[in-house]
Every structure is written in structure tokens, then in C-alpha cells.
Amino acid sequence: MTSRDGYQWTPETGLTQGVPSLGVISPPTNIEDTDKDGPWDVIVIGGGYCGLTATRDLTVAGFKTLLLEARDRIGGRSWSSNIDGYPYEMGGTWVHWHQSHVWREITRYKMHNALSPSFNFSRGVNHFQLRTNPTTSTYMTHEAEDELLRSALHKFTNVDGTNGRTVLPFPHDMFYVPEFRKYDEMSYSERIDQIRDELSLNERSSLEAFILLCSGGTLENSSFGEFLHWWAMSGYTYQGCMDCLISYKFKDGQSAFARRFWEEAAGTGRLGYVFGCPVRSVVNERDAARVTARDGREFAAKRLVCTIPLNVLSTIQFSPALSTERISAMQAGHVNMCTKVHAEVDNKDMRSWTGIAYPFNKLCYAIGDGTTPAGNTHLVCFGTDANHIQPDEDVRETLKAVGQLAPGTFGVKRLVFHNWVKDEFAKGAWFFSRPGMVSECLQGLREKHRGVVFANSDWALGWRSFIDGAIEEGTRAARVVLEELGTKREVKARL
């Protein structure tokens, strides 16, 4: 089925909005009469991985649960579109067995053999292309590419002589060493200034492109401490970063994974749902919560799990008012305004290509990520807020940015993308914090507010902003509700 989300361009059709996805849910609701179908034990707002995990856990535990989702699909900021037999990851892609929460679910759903590697250096050009200006390129082997980035990242992270292990020994407890707060408050640019004399020109260009790929922001507004947190979660090594961040994906796309959560919850017979249902306001007390949708429909439950992303929370009216700490974080928002563009290109040898075009190009980092059924190469390309592009507003500019990654080597047969910056239900891509934001706001964002549990990957303790972090948070939220409402009697009886 086709979602309203996403864009596709081909030379024959031009730009069209809406792409097919396994995540589209039809019919869009199984609720005919809110009074008849209620009352609900729990309402979950948001059908991303956090909301899906909470919904699955609560329905399996015996609770009558209502899922409200603004979109026409599940997955939130992590979903895929299958076009002509090939999955394009619109947001969220890579997973790894070092990400314990997501791997628990992969084994639960017997999908351990459903992964494929993004990189394939077995044929084709088999090189890395570094472009620091529009007219020249430096080519090197992938081994040299690894050494270049490894050297640069080790210099960047080595604030303590141990590549961050001393100042951040427990990544899930970031401020176990109080000194770490100063790194949370430090920007990328401030850290680069400290090591500028140690970096070669190629190291600096590659480093800046890579870390901006991670944050989606600018050198000035991205927290160095947040990158150190990613680094620590990856095992404090360059290879760990590459393995955990950009190496392994689902053969059939993220939405195939999300469907497993959905189908298990629906199979309990305790799931109600309404898609295309943006929320306008939430009124909550200690033992009840009432949600009003934009169209005026009202829903009530004993507890509410709110999984709305940080950059969207300010669009919802909460009564009683939220804490000043949470409001401050909502008003500031995270910095990630990443652009992610998929390009199907007619050069099959680009499958083993990787490249950086920075700082001049609006897409700064790309890799050969697969081969389509037509025999073309799939490139996944990223841009950041440092040199931003709105890919749907000027396709010619987008095509130019793709072409500038490796000029004269391919023709573009298809573009596929989701504009996360203009998406009213995301207002940006994955979470990445401003300097000082985590130390100031993380705890406040995680606090319960009367009958409402706030849960989202944006404030996870571990793989924050990742699918793993979303599952971590959904698990936590469901556990809070279970502890407060107790185990349902009918489930205990079956046990």
C-alpha cells in the first residue's frame, strides 16, 4: 500500500509524493464508537518503535490498549519503502548485535538471518573518493580510507589518553565522572579548535563530514559530548562505530521488522488503533488521562504513554502544565536537520564506492548500499544543516548534489527520500543534542507527569536516537504502567 509520506523522482514521472510501504495500516482504524469500544487501560500516542514496543508489551500483558498515530503507517522516523522489489530506508536503517534491545527483538521474531551488509567491496571501482572542492578528487583504497578516519576520530575523541574510556566509563551513566559535563557543554567546533594542529587537511575534511553526518547539525550547534556517547556505545573504536552505525540492515527493510511488533500486538485481541489521528491536547491526572485529537474526538484511559519526539512535543497542549525543565528542552529542540537521499544510478561498479564531498556540496557523505533488481547501484547520500538542501523543492539542485559526489561516473535513474525537516510529525531527523542539553535536560525529559509516561528514543540512556533506544524506552514505559496498574487477572489465570 502507498503512504502519504515520502517522495520519488524518475526522469519519466518527475517528482511524486507518496511511496509504497509495508508499514501502512489498513483499515486506518478498528474503532467505530469510542464510548462502545472503551474504556481503555492505556493509550499510547505514536506508532514508532517506542510506541510499538510499549503497545506490544502492554497488550501481551493483558491491557486493553489504544494506539493513536498521526501518520498512515507504523515506524515513525524509521520506515522503509519497497519500490520495484527493492527496499529504500527512508529513515532509520542499521542495527547491530551490540545493540542489546534491538537484538533481543530480532531474536524474538527469528530475524537473525534477515540482515544484509551495506558494504560490498568484492567488485567494481572499490575505492574511496574524497572531494574537498568542486574540481578535484583524491582517490584511495578503503584500507586507506579506514586509516584516515581512524586517525582523525582517535584524535577527536582522545580527551583523556584513553579515547574517552576514562571520562565516560559507563555510557548509560554519562555523568558518573563529573568532568564529563564539560564535554557535553563543548561544541564540535570547540573540540576541533583544540586539535586543529594535529589534523592533516584530509583528516579534518573527513572528520568534519563524518561527525556532521552523525549530528545532522552544524559544527557550532552539535555537542561533542553526545558524539563521545555514540563513540563509547560503539566500544571506543573506529571499527566499532562503522559496525554499529552503518553496516548491517534488514534485507526487506525496517518496515518488515516493525510489522512483527504490530502483528503480535494485534494478535492479542486487545489492541485498538486510529491512524491519521494527530493529537491536539492531553489532560491528565494521577489515575486518568484524556486525549483530544485535532478533529475533536476524545479518548480516555487510566494511563497514557506519550512517545512524541522532542521537536514535536511543543505542538501539544498539556494540562496541567509540564515542568519548566521539559518545556525548556521542547523549546530548544534537538539540532538534527539531516537530509537523506537515495539514488539509483546506472553504474553497477559504484556498488563498492564510498565518498565524501565536503564542505562545498549539499550532500557530504555517501556509500554504495546495494544493487537493485534492475542491476543498478543504490547510493545512500546524506547532507546536514551545515549546507542544507530541501530535496523536494528543487529536484535539479538535488540531482546536482548527487552528481557532485562522483562527477561524470553515473546517470541517476531514480531518487527516493523523505523530507524530515518539513515533516510536521518529526521536525528533524534522529535526535542529536545541543551543547549542554543532555546534562541540563535528560533527567527532566524522562520524568513521569502524573498519569503520563513520556518515552522516546530522544531521551534513552543507551543508544539514544537509535532504534535500539526507542525499544529501550518503550520497554521502560510499559514496565512503569505494569508496575502501577498491576498484572491483569486473565493473563495470570492463563499462566
From Swiss-Prot:
Residue positions of motif Microbody targeting signal: 493-495
EC number: 1.4.3.4
Keywords: FAD, Flavoprotein, Oxidoreductase, Peroxisome
Subcellular locations according to the entry: Peroxisome
Catalytic reactions of this protein: a secondary aliphatic amine + O2 + H2O = a primary amine + an aldehyde + H2O2
Source organism of the structure: Aspergillus niger
Protein name, entry field: Monoamine oxidase N
Region (Disordered) location: 1-23
Organism taxonomic ancestry: Eukaryota, Fungi, Dikarya, Ascomycota, Pezizomycotina
Biased composition, class Polar residues, residue ranges: 1-19
Sample GO molecular function, one term: monoamine oxidase activity
Required cofactor(s): FAD
